Amino acid sequence: MPKSEIRKLLQEIKKQVDNPGNSSTTEIKKMASEAGIDEKTAEEIYHLLTEFYQAVEEHGGIEKYMHSNISWLKIELELLSACYQIAILEDMKVLDISEMLSLNDLRIFPKTPSQLQNTYYKLKKELIQVEDIPKNKPGRKRKTQKNTKKEKTNIFGKVVPAEFKAPTSIKEQISYDKSREKNLVDLLSGVKSNVQLLSENQGEENNVYDLLKSIYSLSSLAVQKEELDKKYQDLQTKCQELEQENSYLKQQNETMTDSFHTLVLQVADFAYASDLDQIQALPLFSQQLVVTLNQLGVFKENYKQM
């Protein structure tokens, strides 16, 4: 079954859920039967989608649900699994299914294609269970117990002992606890002190040079990273724009394919009709033909230039 048939079925299911009527299930079963899909499967998706939308309303509507602390509802995951299964059975690719179900196309789920695809694979690999899944909360920082006895610290944040012990080597003079690096002022003060200590010792010029060279290299890397991050963000934005454009072109292609198919059928019906039927049907045929040609972008004003 072509991708367009699966899309039409899911589109009809969403339409019936958005505008329920007494014959909703009947219409869905009829379309499923004509498309060669199990009617029970189509009806199950209809009921799952109905329950999902009801659950969203219970959370205050789609906007509040999208900004709530819930990442996925249990019924939403059941619907996700059912939609992927029905499409995969008809040889659709996971990437195309994700695009079709997402906010970019049918909008069955208030999710992006990547969110749908990642969650489907997690369900398939049983990395997550079919249950309500909350959004990840940022970790809380643990409170550190303050020392009741105030102790003196040096510029590196290291506690100065009561009995001062003179350092025996240059290494001892510049060593400090990295875990106590607090802010930019502490770091710059530490660098300044290290340079002064190294400069006071004869024969340590090379060490000072190496230290400053290392600082320069690290700062250069930081600048390069900043530029790369910006380029990466620009590429991401461009990629999203291309994805949207690609989705639009796919939809346009499907529409033109359907219109071309209609045009062929109209011409064939007229060509193979009897002479009498052709004479009687000519006015209606001409009108239908013009409408279909317009859908394909062919108009009276431009057809000679094509």
Swiss-Prot record:
Task: Tell whether Signal is among the UniProt keywords.
Answer: no
One GO location term (cellular component): cytoplasm
Q: Where in the cell is it found?
A: Cytoplasm
Q: Where are the transmembrane segments?
A: none
Single Gene Ontology MF annotation: DNA binding
Entry keyword set: Cytoplasm, DNA-binding, Repressor, Transcription, Transcription regulation, Virulence
Function summary: Transcriptional repressor of flagellar motility genes, such as flaA, during extracellular growth at 37 degrees Celsius and during intracellular infection. Binds directly to gene promoter region and probably prevents RNA polymerase binding. At low temperatures, MogR repression activity is modulated by the DegU response regulator in an unknown mechanism. Required for full virulence.
* Name of this protein: Motility gene repressor MogR
Source organism of this protein record? Listeria monocytogenes serotype 4b (strain F2365)
- The UniProt gene name for this protein comes to mogR
